Amino acid sequence: AMPTGVTISEKGRIFVSFPKWGDDVKFTVAEIVDNKLVPYPDLKTNKVDYDNLLRCFISVQSVVADGCGTLWVLDTAAPNFSQPIDGGSKLIAVDLNTNKIRRIYSFPDNVVLPTTYLNDVRIDYRVGKEGYAYITDSSDKGPGAIIVVDLSDGRSFRRLNGDSTTTANTDFIPKVEGKVLLNRDTDGKTSQITIAADGIAISEDGKTLYYCPLASRDLYSINTDVLRDESIPDSVLCSYVKYLGEKGASDGMITDSKGIIYAGDYENNSIRRISPDGEMDTIVHSPHLLWPDTFTI
């Protein structure tokens, strides 16, 4: 099975996610214990229960340890990139002290669309009563977006829905391992990669959210205060977006305490570093870096 998410808790525990993309996935979330994969929090939770879809992991794309004793689990509920199973998409908080699910955040139909693919998540506890979560919708069939979740009451809403900055660049044709990358359909025909908003990172002070479509080399940012402000319509919100330049084509991103952004460059088997002053450089290049995705620091 192919891992897409990796995260390390404040106590050094390592967790990995395996979305169901066609491989034989025995469990979609695991903890690495003694160099072995162990279903987390247990095997039962990793078995799809159609009678209780909110209490099980269906196809997890991202896991994020918050450094405060919680593992956040983002369940696409969309195995094989299918339409999300009705009522299955969710954000789950797991207590790392008890290894029990503490809270489940589900989404209404106007937030998780039939085309939605929940990709990655960032958490900020400094705003609101209990904090906010920011999630990328990396749909390749519908509008991309950033989904905002109020962690106090579970309310969620889509922002920059279908905006050009959350949408795949139609002029972008990636080259990976020296070859043009295209979709190949079951009938043998090829089509362009159209994956929308994917990579996401938040600044150390929580005031800036960085994001990028997967089918693009561009990096964007937006102030999180205006992103959360529902009184600002998307038609106006887009004017607050800042274009930060070409960083290379990325899947995942992360920021550190010094305000530096680290982003994968899957076309060049590299990791890029973007300094607060906007300077960009490559810090690692290796043929072993095949499609660098999730980062954890």
Language model segments and positions:
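Beta-strand-rich domains and repeat architectures in extracellular enzymes and scaffolds
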Residues: 1-27
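Beta-rich, blade/repeat-based domains predominating
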Residues: 1-11, 49-74, 111-132, 143, ...
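Conserved beta-strand positions in repeat-built beta-propeller and related beta-rich domains
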Residues: 16-22, 65, 73-77, 84, ...
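Blade-loop segments of beta-propeller domains
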Residues: 28-80, 84, 89-90, 103-111
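Beta-propeller blade signature
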Residues: 29-35, 87-99, 146-154
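Beta-propeller fold detector
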Residues: 35-46, 102-107, 156-174, 229-243, ...
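Short loop/turn segments immediately following beta-strands, especially the blade-tip
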Residues: 97, 151-156, 221-233
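Loop/turn-rich, solvent-exposed surfaces of beta-rich toroidal or solenoidal domains
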Residues: 199-226, 237-282, 292
